[in-house]
Amino acid sequence: MECILDFSISKYEKKVQTAAFEVPSSCLAICFLYELPEQIALLVNMIVEDPSGRVRFQKQLGYSEKVIGLGQSYMDTTIGGISNTIEAGTWTIKVILASEYVKKFFADEKINFTITVTDEMRPIEEHLGEDIWADADFRYAMYDTERVFNPNKRWYKGDFHTHTRLSDGKETPERVMEKAHFMNLDFYAATEHNVMHTGWPKTDILVLPGVEITTSIGHANLFGLKKRPDFLDEILENDNEELLEDIWNRIAVWCKEQEALLSINHPFLYLWKWKYSGFPLEYLSCLEIVNDPTYAAVKEAKAKEANMLAIRMADCLWADGYRICAIGGSDSHNRMDEFYDGATENSIAGDPATWLYMEGLYACGIYQELKKCSACVTRYVEDLDIAIYANGKKVLPGAIIPDSTTSLEWEIYIKSKDYFPKLFVLVNGQRQELLLESDDGQNYVGSGVLEIPKKDYCWIRFGAESIHNEFMMYANPITRGKTAHKLYTFEDVKAVLEI
């Protein structure tokens, strides 16, 4: 079997181009061959559907090898594919262009390219991996959310926003796991642009399947998914902002129905900021408050200012009585040895890190702790312990304490080799400086008693900065009492922040 399918890229071409090919009953695997420069391949998403209309492969072509395999074993199947029986009949390839960027970077030129479809297999370097997650219907039937990776009760360190070659990252899953080990991560969320991992290489790091819903009006990660959502096709195929707002509303409702988590990413960052002002806050589970801090070297992006605004937004939401978990994401795309222009630090998974205190490390437990908001976001912190006591009972960040609580006892430990952490606490937005001490210049400890004002609603947040006011820690607030919401949409928050 062999056929050659023709496609074109220009600002005048259709965003979605479809071609069909026939697969005989004797076929055991399919190989797809193409040739495109990397920067052009980044503009192309490819989806393959079988004769039953099921998605069997989805990927942003990007930085990957130019050979794609789809077979019955993980060794024959490229990342983003589903290894299963190759059904005889009419298969379909969809090529979906990132038309927003095509219009931006293309003048009147046109690039023609072909995809050769054959049953003669080639070696696959970017194969699926031994841990298969998805079945033939793209449900995460083989992903065990209860599998315990570590039984111990402690703080676990991870990253909630990452990329590989499945979308526009430059590293394979195997390589990003090496970097995750280097950063001492316990968990890692795989969040690609509008495409989803179907499996992963064997690893002792807990990998969470997620997706970064990526549109021209904003980006958000989804966690705790049980299957590939149908709306991914709509997201990939549409650019109309009014229609996208409707899709975002449906995504929000779908997440609540599916008990999935929705987290807005880099809400104020440059070209990729959140633009859907009418988005209802009641559907927001998490908020990314620190996104790839190394990107601050790109001056026009104003990434540091964007992250500080996101931190202010999180505080604003807590002050208004919302329980939206602040988390961090490296958004790492680059190689280990690669730096943004002007940067002295490389973008890497785990910078920033998000910590969760858990009685054993497993996926379902992570989702539960995010819903409780018991997370702490850090930079330059190698180890961490936060012990807070309300009426003699130990509580975590994000806890709701009894109305009878008049004070909190706190003990905080931070390990940082390169930066001295200045600890502080915000009580209803009022800042108090706290003392940390160290005997060796890297292990810092402090303790004290914090009085809580007599108010109907109080929120108490511990944080840390370096002596040069660089972000080091954000512990989600502890709250007492309740307050009625005054903010209902993203636009309401922007008005309070005066942006």
Predicted regions and their residues:
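Solvent-exposed, flexible loop/coil segments flanking beta-strands in beta-rich domains
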Residues: 1-35, 116-123, 129-135, 146-152
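Extracellular and analogous surface-interaction loops
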Residues: 18-28, 80-88, 400-404, 452
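Short beta-strand-plus-loop segments that form exposed binding edges in beta-rich domains
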Residues: 36, 94-103, 463-468
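Beta-sandwich interaction modules
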Residues: 64-88, 98-100, 446-452
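Non-catalytic propeptide/linker segments at domain boundaries
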Residues: 86-156
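C-terminal functional module detector
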Residues: 120-124, 142-147, 332-499
